[in-house]
Every structure is written in structure tokens, then in C-alpha cells.
Amino acid sequence: MAKTPAKAPAAAAKPAAVKKPAAPKAAAAPKAAAVATPAAKKPAAPKAAPVSKVAGTREKPDTIRAGTGKLVQVIGAVVDVEFTGELPAILNALETVNIATGQRLVFEVAQHLGQNTVRAIAMDATEGLVRGQEVRDTGQSIRVPVGPGTLGRIMNVIGEPIDEQGPIKSDIFRTIHRDAPTFAEQTNTAEVLVTGIKVIDLMCPYTKGGKIGLFGGAGVGKTVTMQELINNIAKAYGGYSVLAGVGERTREGNDLYHEMIESNVNVDPKINGSTEGSRCALVYGQMNEPPGARARVALTGLSIAEYFRDEEGKDVLLFVDNIFRFTQAGAEVSALLGRIPSAVGYQPTLATEMGNLQERITSTNKGSITSVQAIYVPADDLTDPAPAASFAHLDATTVLSRDIAAQAIFPAVDPLDSTSRIMDPLIIGQEHYDVARSVQEVLQQYKSLKDIIAILGMDELSEEDKLTVARARKISRFLSQPFHVAEQFTNTPGAFVSLKDTIRSFKGIVDGEYDHLPEAAFYMVGPIEEAVAKAEKLAGEA
């Protein structure tokens, strides 16, 4: 009786082994599960999704398995990829090779569509892709090189060099999607960041770790002002700068790169053989790039800046030009993904995307990131959702005026429209606050008198008003300053003016100590001593 049952399983096992099509049935599945431990982990793949999410923001766990899929649909900058096994997490990077160009092409997962299919945004042109070609899941979000090797180099959104100077010499990589610093890591001390530019330091002082909005149209000196800030911060603090060109014109980006070399902010690798000694890294997502690249290039630049802040303890200056184009690219991506648009056609996630970017720009107990963001205002409407989303995060606004630029006063910062959150006597000091308010008062009185002067002339003003106008005109000219980065155009040495000298100089003008000096002496000088010397020179020439 014992032999019969023993033969029965053996007999049953043979048909199971012979009939290979029957292997997928339930009879074979338990046996595979009992024998092969790794196979047993595959059904548990959904549990690994949270781990993948963590990998997208912090570090890459060794336990994540990269899967492969195939391309099933291409719609412009959006592609659908079908996976047979584990689906990649949202924000994971997918890689393939563009058959037409032979170049590596990176996608970012944006949606799970069901039926083992994900929808992803391309970071480069999709011309040349074919259905059915293999796509690999990297198991984490887009990684870019960071560290000193990026200084003086130009890279694109996925960290590839585009300056034709060979590979970027860095073995340190970071993902572009990361968590903002925790509350314990952040510092809440309001410290003034001295830029060496008189009008900014006096009227709208910047904060270390703050966000500054630079409002300006074309041709008012926005690029030169940004360059001077990069130069001054790097010299004064030994810090580094990162420029993220979001929707930049290719010509402007090329000009800026060469201007930085000419102004000694960066080192020319063609002359020196390397970029060692450079102080600025450049990341460009140009105007002709797909919306995915333009929507992520700001995060690439921010990741480089975060490394210098967290690992090297530097005070970093981050420029984003233009925040409006960052928002615009997000709206394009949102439309491609089929999301219902919000107000004025913008993406419904506008506030979230802006918050994710801005919250990472902050001071920690290791270093700081100070961000200067150029912001375009559509149709001069400040209530437009795009600039309105930025306003909630800004600590200071620097407004460049075309009227002031027309008077050849550079930087063309409007001292009456520019504001700062730290314009408080408890933070900047009572003397600084009083001098700044006195300057604003004189300029405001002059502004209100301009109509009377235009109609009736200066002769109809009272003696007190005439004195106010004279001092206001001297203040307006003294707010100008020669820039280091413009030396090659003006043949005038640049001036870095300390905050102490700035306050002392303007206090003297407001108090009437320099009423005897001519207006021309105050134009394009550094501290007040240079104005006095210029007045003596003008008197000697006369």
C-alpha cells in the first residue's frame, strides 16, 4: 500500500515535466516559489515603490532593481513605455539610445497609466525614436555631476557637457529631486549679504539664504548686474556661483560664457588647459529645448549649488534666468500630460512646483544659497499667476527701470520701487535704516516736484525745494557705480563699496555736507572720497 502512493506522485510529476505549456499553471507556481527565493520577491514588487521614491530624493539604495521596458508610443516630447515587470517610480529616470543620432536620451516618469505602462517626459528631442525599442529604468531620478569639477563648465539638464571641453571631471553625483533641509538644519538668523553695489546694499539689502526677484526688461542692464553680483560675491566671500539658464537664448548664453571669461570670473580652458580657478558653473536649458529640459534645468543648477552649501560649507549665489520660463515650461508639460489647466492656462500644480524649487533655497547651519531670479511679468500684470506664485517666496525685489537706464545711470535700479524684507532697524541697524529712509524721502519729494518743474521751471520753486532737487539729483547720480565686469567697455576701474562706506557717504549727502560739489562729480564713482577727488579734478580742468 505504501509503494502505490509513492509511485502516484512520481507519475504525476512526469506529465508536469513533459507538458511544458502547463508550467504557468498553479501546480508549477508553488514549486517555483518554494525552491527559488529570488522569484518569490517579484510578486512583492509593489512594496519597493516607497524605496524608489526615497531614492529619487536622497541616496540610491543598493536594493533597487532596474527594469527594462519597450517604447509603445511617442507624442512629441511625451513617450509611453510598457514594462513587463516592476514599474519605475514617479520621477525615475529612464534611458534609451536615439537610433537616429546614437545619443543617450533620458526621460522622466510623470504618470502611471495602468496596464504596466508609464508616461514620461523627454529631456531632449524625440525625433528618431521607434516603437518597440528598449528603454531601461535607472532606478532613481536624474543624476548630475556636482563639485569643483563643474566650475567653469557648461552642462545641460542631464549633466552632459555642452562646451566642447571634454567630460566633466567629477566623480560625485547627485539626484536633481531632493528634499528641502529640515527645520533643525535651517538657520533663522537674518544676516545681510553685502554685494558691494551701493544702491542694493542701501535701499534693498539682500539676505544670506534669501530669494531675490530681479525685475527688468530687455536692455536695462539685467545681465551685467547679475555678472557683477557673481563677481563680487565670489571675491568677497570666496564663494561659488551657479547660473541656471531656463529658456535662455543660445546667443545670450554663449555671450555670457565668454563675458565671464573676459571678466576673470571663469578661467579660459583653451588658454590655461583647464577650468581650475573658475568660480561659476553654468547649466543651460536653451529656448529650443523640449519643455521637459526647461522645466528641470533649474533643479539641476540647484543640485550643484546644494552640494557647495552642504558639503563644502560655502555661501553660494544661484541665478535663475528666467523664472517665468520655468513656469511656462511646466505649463507645457502639464498640457502634454493631459492635465486640466488652471487659471490663465497654467498648470494646476503651479504653486507646488514653485514651492518645491524655492523651499530648497535656504540657509543651513553649514552654508547658504542666495538666489537671484530674473522674473518676467506678462503684460505688466503683477496679478498674473506666474509672478504671483514667485512673490510669496521672495525676500527682496530689485526693480530695474528703463527710465533710469535712459539717463545712463547704471545699475538702473529704481530705489523707490525696490523692497527688502530685512529693511528693519532691528536687523540692519538704526543708522542704516534712517539713512535709507532719508534717501527715499528726498527722492520721493523730487519725484513729486518733477511735474511742477516741467511746467513752470526751477525758478518757481522755493529755496527749500531747490535744495531738495539739487540733493536728489546728486543722490540719483551717486547711486550709479562702475562695475568690474564692465571695465573693458567703459575703461573705468570697477568699485566695490563696503556697506559702512555706503551708509556714511549717503548720510553726508542728505545732511548737506557735499552741497558745494557739482552733480557731475557724483556720477560713476565708488565711495564719497572719489566724488570729492573728481570734483577737484573737474575744478582744475575748468
Swiss-Prot record:
Topological type in the membrane: Peripheral membrane protein
- Could you state a single Gene Ontology molecular function term? ATP hydrolysis activity
Per UniProt, the ranges with Low complexity bias are 1-50
Q: Which UniProt keywords apply?
A: ATP synthesis, ATP-binding, Cell inner membrane, Cell membrane, CF(1), Hydrogen ion transport, Ion transport, Membrane, Nucleotide-binding, Translocase, Transport
CDD domains named in the record: ATP-synt_F1_beta_C (cd18110), ATP-synt_F1_beta_N (cd18115), F1-ATPase_beta_CD (cd01133)
Give the matching InterPro entries. AAA+_ATPase (IPR003593), ATP-synt_VA_C (IPR055190), ATP_synth_F1_bsu (IPR005722), ATPase_a/bsu_AS (IPR020003), ATPase_alpha/beta_chains (IPR050053), ATPase_F1/V1/A1_a/bsu_N (IPR004100), ATPase_F1/V1/A1_a/bsu_N_sf (IPR036121), ATPase_F1/V1/A1_a/bsu_nucl-bd (IPR000194)
Q: What's the catalysed reaction?
A: ATP + H2O + 4 H(+)(in) = ADP + phosphate + 5 H(+)(out)
Q: Where is it chiefly localized?
A: membrane
Q: Where located?
A: Cell inner membrane
Residues at which ATP binds: G216, G217, A218, G219, V220, G221, K222, T223
Asked if the keyword RNA-binding belongs to this entry, the reply reads: no
- One cellular component (GO) term of this entry: plasma membrane
Span list, region Disordered:
1-61
Top enzyme category:
translocase
Q: What is its EC number?
A: 7.1.2.2
Subunit relationships: F-type ATPases have 2 components, CF(1) - the catalytic core - and CF(0) - the membrane proton channel. CF(1) has five subunits: alpha(3), beta(3), gamma(1), delta(1), epsilon(1). CF(0) has three main subunits: a(1), b(2) and c(9-12). The alpha and beta chains form an alternating ring which encloses part of the gamma chain. CF(1) is attached to CF(0) by a central stalk formed by the gamma and epsilon chains, while a peripheral stalk is formed by the delta and b chains.
Task: State the family named in the UniProt similarity comment for this chain.
Answer: Belongs to the ATPase alpha/beta chains family.
Q: What does this protein do?
A: Produces ATP from ADP in the presence of a proton gradient across the membrane. The catalytic sites are hosted primarily by the beta subunits.
Q: Which PANTHER family match?
A: ATP SYNTHASE, ATP SYNTHASE SUBUNIT BETA, MITOCHONDRIAL
Q: What is this protein called?
A: ATP synthase subunit beta
